Amino acid sequence: MDFSTNGSEESELYHAQIHLYKHVYNFVSSMALKSAMELGIADAIHNHGKPMTLPELSSSLKLHPSKVNILYRFLRLLTHNGFFAKTTVKSNEGEEETAYVLTPSSKLLVSGKSTCLSSLVKGALHPSSLDMWGVSKKWFHEDKEQTLFECATGENYWDFLNKDSDSLSMFQDAMAADSRLFKLAIQENKHVFEGLESLVDVAGGTGGVAKLIHEAFPHIKCTVFDQPQVVGNLTGNENLNFVGGDMFKSVPSADAVLLKWVLHDWNDELSLKILKNSKEAISHKGKDGKVIIIDISIDENSDDRGLTELQLEYDVVMLTMFLGKERTKKEWEKLIYDAGFSRYKITPICGFKSLIEVYP
């Protein structure tokens, strides 16, 4: 190899090296975050009620004295990444000491809060989600339609969850945690639900989203529709009930059908079935309702590169776990029109997701 380069080429080479190394070692930041969550660092600082010094934090976490410097170095990385912030406090002797406080991001890891997303972090970084990448080369070369997860484990993710109660509970907790943040979207987009008398939350799990909608709009009769083994033992009330069934066969009738975090699990063929069944469900009593989709709408030309990167990463997650996909506006439009709908409206919500209203 010829290492004779001019200044411009040297600079380009160094920047390329930094870019490569950064992506190679991105996993360190993820695992440091997981360690912080498992140690309960955010909980410790929150419960302390004020900025926390390194010795105070180490003592609260009951760490061995030899690990104090290791904790410092983890905190240095996590602080650089925006999960904690540093401030200065006075010690009992009047000397200034560095102390740590929570940031908006680490507040999402505080246990017991309605906005806590610890279960999502735990699920995304669980060995079952990471180990599959070891067979990616085999997956690319084999002539078989299966997920990367199935290639690695011999079973699809849904079957894995149904056999592993701990993983199923973790998955349901993660979905419920994500749904709790949906409350903000409801408050900011009340007009979407105004005028509705009934709504079906398809694949609504244990009813977290339906309950939020019911709280905000008590007059709306909400039905949570999911697999019988998911909703079979759940109890509702006069305006909130649970129905078991198969969304690929039919969907209960209502003024509106909600598909939150559903269609990205499935390829276009299966998503088309769900949408057609949803269209039939809202066409009753001589009037047409609407389908409300909560999902990602990828904008590859967005000025927010971080947002687009997250959306594209989610797309690869859906691909490797479920053979699903995150869709661009053009892909959403084709899917919606192929299902027989006449118009739609996309509204960005919840940071990186979109609310898509679809009409017959």
From Swiss-Prot:
The keyword Transferase applies. Gene3D superfamilies: Vaccinia Virus protein VP39 (3.40.50.150), Winged helix-like DNA-binding domain superfamily/Winged helix DNA-binding domain (1.10.10.10). S-adenosyl-L-methionine binds at residues 202-205, 226-227, 246-247, 260. It catalyses: (+)-6a-hydroxymaackiain + S-adenosyl-L-methionine = (+)-pisatin + S-adenosyl-L-homocysteine + H(+); a 4'-hydroxyisoflavone + S-adenosyl-L-methionine = a 4'-methoxyisoflavone + S-adenosyl-L-homocysteine + H(+). GO terms for molecular function: 6a-hydroxymaackiain-3-O-methyltransferase activity; isoflavone 4'-O-methyltransferase activity; O-methyltransferase activity; protein dimerization activity. It comes from the Eukaryota. Its EC number is 2.1.1.270, 2.1.1.46. The keyword GTP-binding does not apply. InterPro entries: COMT-like, O_MeTrfase_dom, Plant_O-MeTrfase_dimerisation, SAM-dependent_MTases_sf, WH-like_DNA-bd_sf, WH_DNA-bd_sf. Pfam families: Dimerisation, Methyltransf_2. GO terms for biological process: methylation. The active site is at 264 (proton acceptor). It is an enzyme of class 2 (transferase). Keywords: Methyltransferase, S-adenosyl-L-methionine, Transferase. Methyltransferase involved in the phytoalexin pisatin biosynthesis. Has both 3- and 4'-O-methyltransferase activities. Can use (+)-6a-hydroxymaackiain, 2,7,4'-trihydroxyisoflavanone and with much less activity (+)-medicarpin as substrates, but not (-)-6a-hydroxymaackiain, daidzein, formononetin or isoliquiritigenin. May be involved in formononetin biosynthesis. Belongs to the class I-like SAM-binding methyltransferase superfamily. Cation-independent O-methyltransferase family. COMT subfamily. This is (+)-6a-hydroxymaackiain 3-O-methyltransferase 1. It comes from Pisum sativum. The gene is HMM1.
